[in-house]
Amino acid sequence: MGIIAKQSIQGTIVTYLGVAVGFVTTFFVLTRFLSAEEIGLSRVLIDAATLFIGLAQLGTSSSIIRFYPHFRNKEQGTKSQDDHGFFFWTLIVPLVGFALFTAIYCACHEPLSRWFGEKSPLFVEYYYMVLPMAFFMLYQTIFETNANVRMHIVVPRAVRELITRIGLLVVYLLYAFECLTINGFVVALCGVYAVAMLCNMGYLFSLGEIALRPDWEFLRNNRLLIRQYLLYTGFLLISAVASVLAPTLSSFFITAEMGLNYTGIFAIATYIAVMVSIPYRSMT
């Protein structure tokens, strides 16, 4: 059995295990121990962070998949210096995007607070907690994609589908049994994604297939490739507005116009619909 087929099967198993954890969390923990408003708060924070990283990464995840073969030194196989500093730029580009959209997000605090404030003041209170959560989610994704293009799929998927969900389950239970205040609950949610990011980062560095040093000579000799990369990234940023906004738009409108209680109800209903997409997710 080839490595791709083997990892695909293992990845599918991991995905279904993650679904099982998510099912238990959603239908036996959230609905029993948390109020609709608390469920809604966690949902809208995660949705806001998801929207943020979809824009802030500046198309880096797709660019990694598209351009890594052009940077990889095929003569050296999978040695640590084989990507001509490509990994370095996959860290820098989203960092620039994060800084840019952080400034925009902070500038929008007042108008968004007015929009959400009447029906969902609790979200306004934790408005800035979206930023650290988004940062951790952003680099969790970047590290995962870098591992995937190096044909290491199972562990990053286990982090995304299992470790993250188990971490969220633990946080929900700690809050349910009053081991955490609402402030601690929100901080712990961010902490789950911080742990996931560190797991992916540690795994990627343990492979010994990456280097942080940029290869300036390679960039000077391949300026056309760099222009193609920038053009491709620009198109991805435009398309990300629609592709990332569409799945989260309903959550934001419900939160602003109806309140977090309804967002919580919507989150439970959405999870049922998401289960239909399991076969697709197991292949991505």
Predicted feature residues:
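Interhelical loop/hinge segments that connect adjacent transmembrane helices in multipass membrane
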Residues: M1-I4, I182-L189, L198-P247
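Signature of the first transmembrane helix
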Residues: I3-S62, T102-C106, M133, L231-L260, ...
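Membrane-interface junctions at transmembrane-helix termini in multi-pass inner-membrane proteins
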Residues: A5, F136-R160
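Membrane-water interface segments that mark the loop-to-transmembrane alpha-helix transition
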Residues: K6-V19, L45, Q57-S113, E125-Y128
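Helix-loop junctions and terminal segments of transmembrane helices
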Residues: F27, Q57-K74, V149, A269, ...
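Interfacial segments at transmembrane-helix termini and the short loops linking adjacent helices
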Residues: A36-E37, H109-V130, L260
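Alpha-helical transmembrane segments of multi-pass membrane proteins
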Residues: L51, A103, E118-F143, A194
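Hydrophobic alpha-helical transmembrane segments
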Residues: Y128, V159-E209, I265-T270
